[in-house]
Amino acid sequence: MPVDSRRLQGPESAFSYTLLEKKDANAEESILSADMQKMLIDSKQIRKDKRKPTDARPLFLRTGIISQAKGSAYIEQGNTKLVCGVYGPREVQKKSDFRLNGQLFCEFKFAPFSCQKRRSHQQDNEELVLSGLLREALEAAVCLHHFPKAQVEVNVMVIENDGSPLAAALTCASLALSSASIPMYDLVVGASVRQLPKVLLLDPTKDEEWQPELSHDQNNSNLTVGYMPSMQQVCAYVHEGVSNTEDLEQMLKLVTEYCLKVQPIVQLCLKETVEKMLANEGENKDAE
């Protein structure tokens, strides 16, 4: 097998193994956890952005952003901003990819200017993983048997990343698919929560998200969930870090309750989209 000798044969990013080394005493880890918690939340249980632990960031939704796409949506969740375009259904080009049911092709991409560190124009490993998670979640909600031998493309672009991009992408992609008249079992609403040793932070920002190089002790994790409220089913479950069963139950309960609150907002946005579509069709008929 040919090998590129000029390329570094190592991971794209790495951190010192000493951060993962277990100490004989747990005093250092407890001090790190306490200091981290003080950085994220003060003694009055108020976060940096003046939110309470169980408060979410302001949410803004809009459809019809991309005129060339069959369906599109835009979401703002605090300073996290994403746009999603849906194209198809289209005939599958490769015979090797032929299937009786329809297929979903999902692409998750960070804009080069979306993060503090400039991102590459080509997809990196993180974006490939997020694309796969997005596809697996949406496949559970889309009626793939309604468009056999065809493919629907879902393209998500992160314009600004301030935390919880996958959760925002799930909500945005679900709204874009609905606006494109793609049959679905239910809408998908995404939510995430950060676990600290003594408190749960709903809808974490970039600074509040779990980081493996800084959070390698127990009861310190991040959970992202894609939830179908009407069917009361979870279609995406991504957990990073270390948590016990009781804490996971509390985290799942918190995010599902938040998804139930967001569902009417998504439905209202979709209702306004349908009303505008019907109004435009009526105007075109009157003009003829």
Predicted regions and their residues:
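Polyanion-binding surfaces on beta-sheet-dominated domains and ring/shell assemblies
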Residues: 1-288
